[in-house]
């Protein structure tokens, strides 16, 4: 019994050591721009295109309104204006209310309703690609541009190509930074003397947390990429 307990104690010790080291590395990286660069790489790698698309494919995966879907719809509507002859495809798991809201959002941004098509099947990227290939097989030989979050772009493009689509590019829905001085007068606002003054430390106030969130998104995506690779889906 003592030997078994000793083994478990050693095992837990190593687990906590590894997890602690991993979290420490994540915290250190959050003070650098590496998380942003990794996210940008995922959004741009394998997604470049030089053609005028025949179809713009919006890949949804959240409710409405939501940050993820609204920014993707923003990019989709911008592409729709840039390429007025392209069809618009909303690919989203079957939820008639959410899909209707997405369609209305595009129409609100001056996208002709006659250009909008719906694919309601598919609960993940692989399923969505196969469903679109089956239900709209004419798209297999046409020029596509996918719209999704930056972290999802690499996997999405490769998954659609694996599903048989010949020409697939992507437009990652990147957030744009706000270039404004967000510093403030700590004393003027009544800041207490024993509380640290971070009024001019934008890295700690914003960048650290944003990069920490990017790290989590990228880690989740690399896990998904590994899963798709092991299954031969991309």
Residue ranges and their predicted role:
Residues 13-32:
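Hydrophobic membrane-insertion alpha-helices, especially the h-region
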Residues 1-11:
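N-terminal Lys/Arg-rich, disordered targeting/topogenic segments
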Residues 198-211, 216:
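Extended, charge-rich low-complexity interaction segments
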Residues 28-204:
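A structural signal for short, hydrophobic/glycine-enriched beta-strand patches
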Residues 37, 210-234:
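A transmembrane-helix-recognition feature enriched in membrane-embedded lipid enzymes
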